[in-house]
Amino acid sequence: MTASTDRYAASLRLSVAPMMDWTDRHCRVFHRLLAPSARLYTEMVHANAVIHGDRARLIGFDPVEHPLALQLGGSDPALLAQAAAIAQEWGFDEINLNCGCPSDRVQAGRFGACLMREPALVAECVAAMCAATHLPITVKCRLGVDDDDDYALFARFVDQVVAAGAAMVVVHARNAWLKGLSPKENREVPPLRYDWAYRLKQERPGLPVVLNGGIVAVEPAIAHLQHADGVMLGRAAYHDPYVLHCLDAALNQRPEQPRESLLRAYQPYVESQLAQGLGLKHMTRHVLGLFHGQPGGRAFRQVLSEGAHRPGAGWELVEQALERTDTRSWRVVA
């Protein structure tokens, strides 16, 4: 096993969910600084976009982001296979198929969560991607759609995609309601059923199972790891990113670093992007939650939110934002 594959294998325990409009390359670099051992995921990119679009913009990444997975959307096996081959050329560590997004636009394109009703098609897609690349092909899914209330149906879906070659499943442990709820509501309203994911792992001990959904703190995340191979943080990693750092530190028996130190570690990357003509707001929007719940946290967000969009804004604005925080919040909490 090479160092890169060993690092990829070790990253199974903690990952950051693919989140549209959030987990872009700038966010992922920041998350890598917070969580050196975590597995990172891109935003979902449709297979057609990978094949025909501006790849540098859509799937380009900084080498520091490894281990990194590309999440693909789509339901055409041939197109997904072609996109998977491109992903291998670009150096990704994993390809993940989205079978969990419930948005109307995604449904209209016949991909995302609605694919849970077509397990044979998903299996065909997985098999095609496996034939096109040596990278591990994984699937992110829900427990079911709409009123599905049948563990056996969920388990059969998983068994079909695993038989086709899926190396791992990420289970968002709630149903997707395809009508009547927004994507945001679909992350909150359908009840969580962690026990289904636990049972899946118990009955299939050789299958890597990663649990996603409603994980917002270190202690519950560690408790979930008694029943699953990994945990995937979603909104918590974005709105309160220090939780991501603390969980990565706990899992790897490393001391937690002060928030200010983590932010300053981001400075060289930010300044390199500024030098290329990118606006400050593209980087700082991902750090707004770093002082969540801390003295001065609201003022920190306000300074960055109001100033980062201005022409010529630079790192000095981040320094101004830091000055608004209470320095006591920078200490390491025992």
Curated annotation (Swiss-Prot):
Q: Which PROSITE patterns match?
A: UPF0034
Could you tell me the EC number(s) of this protein? 1.3.1.-, 1.3.1.91
Q: Which CDD domains match?
A: DUS_like_FMN (cd02801)
User: Could you name the active-site residues?
Assistant: 101
An example molecular function term from Gene Ontology annotations: flavin adenine dinucleotide binding
Q: Which cofactor does it need?
A: FMN
Annotated FMN binding sites:
18-20, 71, 140, 172, 212-214, 234-235
Spell out the HAMAP family in the cross-references.
DusA_subfam
What's this protein's family per the entry?
Answer: Belongs to the Dus family. DusA subfamily.
The protein's matches in PANTHER family, at most eight in alphabetical order, are given as: FMN-LINKED OXIDOREDUCTASES SUPERFAMILY PROTEIN
Any idea what this protein is called? Answer: tRNA-dihydrouridine(20/20a) synthase
